[in-house]
Amino acid sequence: MRILVVDNYDSFVFNLVQYLGQLGIEAEVWRNDDHRLSDEAAVAGQFDGVLLSPGPGTPERAGASVSIVHACAAAHTPLLGVCLGHQAIGVAFGATVDRAPELLHGKTSSVFHTNVGVLQGLPDPFTATRYHSLTILPKSLPAVLRVTARTSSGVIMAVQHTGLPIHGVQFHPESILTEGGHRILANWLTCCGWTQDDTLVRRLENEVLTAISPHFPTSTASAGEATGRTSA
């Protein structure tokens, strides 16, 4: 299986790559201005799935990101957008991305979802780590994108295309404080043709819980996560 991660110059993109590797996937990583992305249609045709990473700035300034969304849509290639990549999906289909009601950098929120797509099998709500100042504006969302997760205040946390294998999450599944990060990626990989190993996914989830529990008890985990992330 060939999976491409488009790196939007995010400081923690290799956490995503590591999670994929733990699921048995050796992803290729190309920067968003890599010359190989100039033929987006060819790229969409040669990979089983494309992941658009988080990163700083706006979708329009994230190299080939928006063009890759169009190419994957045309080829029906499974696509997952994370944070900035999620916003690129919105822009590609006509939504407006603008300032979020609150600026969050390394803070956790409860996310309420519809238990479909990449979020299937997660607790409702689940805890997710957020690093963003921009968001897809709900009133601008086109009919082809449906909201699959929100915060309690209504900020869009995930979208899914109504007819294509295209998914976006505003939060960061690769953060150690996000519940079910491996499961989210595993759910997406099944769209790409991967046979899900639920025993493996549960083991990885338990390893994350074991690693953080001595340092981030439930009462303090929501206080946030201090990192040097550069995401928008």
From Swiss-Prot:
GO terms for molecular function: anthranilate synthase activity. Part of a heterotetrameric complex that catalyzes the two-step biosynthesis of anthranilate, an intermediate in the biosynthesis of L-tryptophan. In the first step, the glutamine-binding beta subunit (TrpG) of anthranilate synthase (AS) provides the glutamine amidotransferase activity which generates ammonia as a substrate that, along with chorismate, is used in the second step, catalyzed by the large alpha subunit of AS (TrpE) to produce anthranilate. In the absence of TrpG, TrpE can synthesize anthranilate directly from chorismate and high concentrations of ammonia. GO terms for biological process: L-tryptophan biosynthetic process. The gene is trpG. Keywords: Amino-acid biosynthesis, Aromatic amino acid biosynthesis, Glutamine amidotransferase, Lyase, Tryptophan biosynthesis. CDD domains: GATase1_Anthranilate_Synthase. Heterotetramer consisting of two non-identical subunits: a beta subunit (TrpG) and a large alpha subunit (TrpE). Its EC number is 4.1.3.27. This is Anthranilate synthase component 2. GO terms for cellular component: plasma membrane. Was identified as a high-confidence drug target. The active site is at C83 (nucleophile), H172 (for gatase activity), E174 (for gatase activity). Pathway: Amino-acid biosynthesis; L-tryptophan biosynthesis; L-tryptophan from chorismate: step 1/5. Residues 2-198 form the Glutamine amidotransferase type-1 domain. It catalyses: chorismate + L-glutamine = anthranilate + pyruvate + L-glutamate + H(+).
